[in-house]
């Protein structure tokens, strides 16, 4: 690849096929995949490149388009997968920590309030970005402070939960960010009670979601005063399919790659569902899955 990249301490990989790296098993090639070895390495890269910088986490809620991703794609690795207890029912976690691991760590520390995270695929960084939530709880309710690197100026910032301006499945920060660390706070509880709640969340998820299929979580956010899956179902979308992509019969707010679908199949099917709901209810569904790459 004939491009000039800053000299870093982390790892560059070139021409990476994203269909091998995403939960949906779709997507073209990323020009450059970069795993920084620490925050300083990450900030140095951003400050010393003119290439566009994108961010991926566990890739559990993204569609990478068939054309791939231009520029540099950052993925936090094991160096950002640390979890430690701070005392006073507080936990510090790096941006690459899986949310399920955070939930189990909290349980082992007898810290309650984070059990809902056990059923959410993805990382701390991704969960902070989208204010991930389930069963009436969300990241905003348990996060205390956040460290983030701005993708435009490359500087490190720290925000309180209030400064994030959280709302349903989003936040109010301007610009593009990569969330590298967060502090969470729960309440003390008995281990057996926490363990029971963890089991209940997992069982509920297993009963209602297509966990064994190639999916990327919920397609759409719930519109105000509606549930997305109900609108999709009542719009007659349950049997829709395009190419190798179809709507899950177990939970119709999930896309499935069931037969070698392309990214275009999945994105077009999602847009077809959007159009059907708009025509039936005059409600505009908003993607919860992130779509990366250009046409």
From Swiss-Prot:
Record EC number: 1.3.1.98
**Name of protein:** UDP-N-acetylenolpyruvoylglucosamine reductase
Keyword terms of this UniProt record = Cell cycle, Cell division, Cell shape, Cell wall biogenesis/degradation, Cytoplasm, FAD, Flavoprotein, NADP, Oxidoreductase, Peptidoglycan synthesis
Q: Write out the annotated subcellular location.
A: Cytoplasm
Its domain of life reads Bacteria
Functional summary from the UniProt entry: Cell wall formation.
Q: Which Gene3D superfamilies match?
A: 3.30.465.10, UDP-N-acetylenolpyruvoylglucosamine reductase, C-terminal domain, Uridine Diphospho-n-acetylenolpyruvylglucosamine Reductase, domain 2
First-level EC class: oxidoreductase
A single Gene Ontology CC term: cytosol
* HAMAP family cross-referenced by the UniProt entry: MurB (MF_00037)
Q: Which gene encodes it?
A: murB
Show the active-site residues.
Answer: 169, 218, 288
């Amino acid at each position: 690849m004939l491009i000039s990249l800053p000299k870093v301490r982390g790892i560059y990989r070139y021409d990476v096929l994203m269909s091998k790296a995403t939960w949906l098993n779709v997507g073209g090639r990323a020009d450059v995949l970069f795993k920084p070895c620490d925050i300083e390495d990450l900030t140095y890269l951003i400050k010393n490149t003119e290439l566009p910088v994108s961010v991926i986490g566990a890739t559990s809620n993204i569609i990478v388009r068939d054309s791939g991703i231009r520029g540099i794609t950052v993925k936090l690795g094991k160096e950002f997968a640390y979890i430690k207890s701070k005392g006073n029912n507080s936990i510090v976690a790096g941006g690459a920590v899986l949310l399920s691991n955070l939930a189990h760590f909290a349980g082992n520390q007898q810290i309650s309030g984070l059990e809902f995270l056990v059923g959410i695929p993805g990382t701390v960084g991704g969960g902070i970005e989208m204010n991930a939530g389930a069963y009436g709880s969300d990241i905003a309710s348990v996060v205390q402070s956040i460290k983030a690197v701005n993708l435009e100026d490359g500087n490190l910032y720290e925000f309180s939960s209030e400064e994030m301006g959280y709302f349903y499945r989003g936040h109010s920060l301007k610009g593009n960010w990569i969330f590298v660390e967060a502090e969470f706070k729960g309440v003390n509880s008995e281990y057996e009670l926490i363990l029971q709640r963890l089991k209940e969340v997992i069982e509920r998820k297993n009963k209602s979601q297509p966990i064994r299929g190639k999916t990327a979580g919920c397609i759409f956010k719930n519109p105000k005063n509606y549930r997305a899956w109900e609108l999709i179902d009542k719009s007659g979308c349950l049997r829709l399919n395009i190419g190798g992509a179809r709507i899950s019969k177990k939970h119709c707010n999930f896309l499935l790659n069931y037969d070698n679908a392309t990214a275009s199949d999945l994105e077009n099917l999602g847009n077809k569902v959007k159009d059907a709901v708009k025509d039936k209810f005059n409600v505009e569904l908003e993607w919860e899955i992130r779509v990366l790459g250009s046409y």
